[in-house]
Design a protein with these regions (language model features):
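Short, conserved micro-motifs composed of acidic
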Residues: 1-27
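Basic, alpha-helical interaction scaffolds
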Residues: 22-91
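Structured loops at beta-to-helix junctions and adjacent beta-edge loops in soluble globular domains
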Residues: 3-6, 18, 35-37, 193-195
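Generic alpha-helical structural element
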Residues: 21, 42-49, 66, 70-77, ...
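Short conserved micro-motifs at the rims of enzyme active sites and ligand-binding pockets
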Residues: 11-14, 43-46, 139, 199-201
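Short linear motifs embedded in intrinsically disordered, charge-biased segments
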Residues: 97-201
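Arg/Lys-enriched, amphipathic patches
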Residues: 75-78, 84-85, 89-99, 109-117
Length: 201
């Protein structure tokens, strides 16, 4: 897999191992359950997560037809369906487009419709009724918790550079030096985003 947007250095990728021939160059690959594309976008990851969550929605419909209580259906969605839409979210959350975020939200809305037996125009009202949360807010909280645990873990403290001058002129505490990103893609990637989240207390 080749990661490069440069036209000047866009050379053909060829790797050979002994006499086994040339390795195939792929545009996407699954790494620890996360679909990574050479374009550094998350279309394939979102599609895969929605597909897995949709399988759980089918089970919810089946359980509802058998008379399973609504509270148990909600619990099943939380433990089996929603987790599919949040898998490894610290890696990809900051790089989502609006359309990708909406596709994840729609999967939860379909699940809520399957649980209640009706489609509500008001997303917020149905979330409150079932005791669920917006996915984007949950992802933000998960990312911040992940960043805090990583920063406090002695094995990974080198990921975040500690700011020697924690106080700025505006009086805001800046615990970690933020990464200077020359491109919007890098700015929206995981490490710069997590650093900003750690500084936003």
């Amino acid at each position: 897999m080749k990661f490069s947007r440069s036209r000047k250095f866009d050379f053909p990728t060829e790797f050979t191992i002994g006499n086994s021939g040339t390795l195939e160059v792929k545009t996407e690959h699954k790494i620890l359950g996360v679909m990574v594309q050479n374009s550094l976008k998350w279309d394939s990851q979102c599609t895969e997560m929605v597909r897995k969550a949709t399988n759980c929605i089918w089970v919810i419909r089946r359980m509802k037809s058998l008379g399973v209580r609504q509270s148990l259906l909600v619990q099943y969605w939380k433990s089996e369906g929603r987790v599919m839409l949040e898998y490894a979210c610290p890696v990809w959350h900051s790089g989502l487009t609006v359309a990708q975020s909406r596709s994840l939200d729609r999967a939860q809305r379909v699940a809520m419709a399957a649980i209640t037996g009706r489609w509500e125009r008001s997303h917020s009202a149905q979330l409150r009724e079932l005791g669920l949360e917006r996915l984007d807010l949950r992802r933000q909280r998960i990312c911040k918790r992940f960043g805090e645990r990583t920063a406090n873990d002695s094995r990974h403290q080198d990921m975040f550079a500690v700011n020697p001058n924690t106080r700025t002129r505006g009086g805001k505490d800046i615990r970690y030096l933020e990464i200077n990103a020359r491109t919007s893609t890098y700015y929206k990637s995981a490490l710069p985003y997590l650093t900003r989240q750690l500084n936003n207390n």
